[in-house]
Amino acid sequence: MNPQPSGMTWNLLLLTWLVALISTLSALFIGEVMGQAPCVLCWFQRAFMFPLTVILAIACYRSDFTVWRYALPLTVIGAALAFVHTLLYAGLIPQPIQPCTATGPSCSGAGMTLFGVVPLPALALFAFIIIAILLIIIRRRTTP
């Protein structure tokens, strides 16, 4: 017998979708409006964030609280990529294996920070972590 999801659980699902939506719209704004071309790792992170926006929107519409089963793997992989990207940005990964500087745009520019302080890869990592935490909370509230 599954516990009956409360209105609070649906609000958490909505919040999860909003985090994914804001992340997706922000990435599109930076790339399309500001004209900043994403690096290779940014593209991979987008490949995991963009589908989350659609999946979580459908889950909200259908009140599908089992969404964690297929959204959490995307979130964990996206977070792992964002973590590696953050380490690259911080210079903690050696130069020879940095995919961002070999060809295409670099992650080391000043345009890769929010307000000149928080790097965009760290923001992506934060978004993936928030989504993962919310999905785990939803799972715990709806699974016996």
From Swiss-Prot:
SUPFAM superfamilies the record matches: DsbB-like (SSF158442)
A Gene Ontology term for the protein's cellular component: plasma membrane
Record's subcellular location: Cell inner membrane
Superkingdom, taxonomy of origin: Bacteria
Location (main, coarse): membrane
Segments crossing the lipid bilayer: 10-29, 44-63, 70-87, 116-138
Protein name, UniProt field: Probable disulfide formation protein
Organism expressing this protein natively: Metapseudomonas resinovorans (Pseudomonas resinovorans)
